[in-house]
Amino acid sequence: MAVNILTLPAPAKLNLFLHIIGRRSDGYHNLQTVFQFLDYADTLKFYTAADDKFDLIDHDSHIPRDENLVWKALTALRKTYEEKGITQLPGCSIELIKRLPQGAGLGGGSSNAATALVGLNQLWGSHLNSTELQAIGRKLGADVPVFIHGHACFAEGIGDVFTNITPPTPWYLVVKPNVSISTAALFSHPKLERNCSPVTADNWQQQKVANVFEPVVCDLHTEVAMLRRALLEYAPTRLTGSGACLFSTFETRQAAKEAQQQVPKELCSFIAQGQNRSPLIQTLTQ
């Protein structure tokens, strides 16, 4: 019988702001953003498996296994271990329990991949350090490294050069409009600001920062614009990532709860507190 040997969270993240400060020679954009984690997460459960086989149990996703980021993470980590000459790896089964909405700007898939890499590396003897795991994660998705890094940070480059910071940890009301965001449409939109003035890890809180995708998403999706206006009646509100989620900032959970009661019931919403140490890292160091 399979035995649960490790259970780890795959937390959400917020982009407290997001600027594009130019285009790189490789076609990517240079970004500046602040990542902060939430105490709201998917869960990965790791089980022993007979015959050294590997499996993924995903109850909620219609994504084929070979396209699932958890499976891609497992495959990539096995390959890296084998390149190091470590081939006798114990089999395991990973159960993915989803809680985070998809297509939300919360980094759910990337967080799943990061937790898979960190968890499997621990189960297999911790032969890779954080920098090596981040290098694997970078090939899976631009947001994977920050979840492995595990601390709130001011991020630059393509979002993978980190300076640790300790911003306030308020309560957030996070709401997902019922829209599907095309990232390609956002990057090609004429209203997208691509040359923001740079800020720094020390002064970003004193600057007029924003999410450059927010006006574009609101222009393309009136539902987002209307929800944003409604939430602004209660608290400062901003888009996270490229959307579709909006987050409103409150000093207390009660204030966030009162605002949540006004959110239409057909929309996905939740309340969470900001975390400067990732819940994944907190769990591993308990």
Swiss-Prot record:
GO terms for molecular function: 4-(cytidine 5'-diphospho)-2-C-methyl-D-erythritol kinase activity; ATP binding. Disulfide bonds: none annotated. It comes from the Bacteria. InterPro entries: GHMP_kinase_C_dom, GHMP_kinase_C_sf, GHMP_kinase_N_dom, IspE, Ribosomal_Su5_D2-typ_SF, Ribsml_uS5_D2-typ_fold_subgr. It holds the Pfam family GHMP_kinases_N. Its EC number is 2.7.1.148. Keywords: ATP-binding, Isoprene biosynthesis, Kinase, Nucleotide-binding, Transferase. Catalyzes the phosphorylation of the position 2 hydroxy group of 4-diphosphocytidyl-2C-methyl-D-erythritol. Belongs to the GHMP kinase family. IspE subfamily. This is 4-diphosphocytidyl-2-C-methyl-D-erythritol kinase. It comes from Idiomarina loihiensis (strain ATCC BAA-735 / DSM 15497 / L2-TR). The lineage of its organism: Bacteria, Pseudomonadati, Pseudomonadota, Gammaproteobacteria, Alteromonadales.
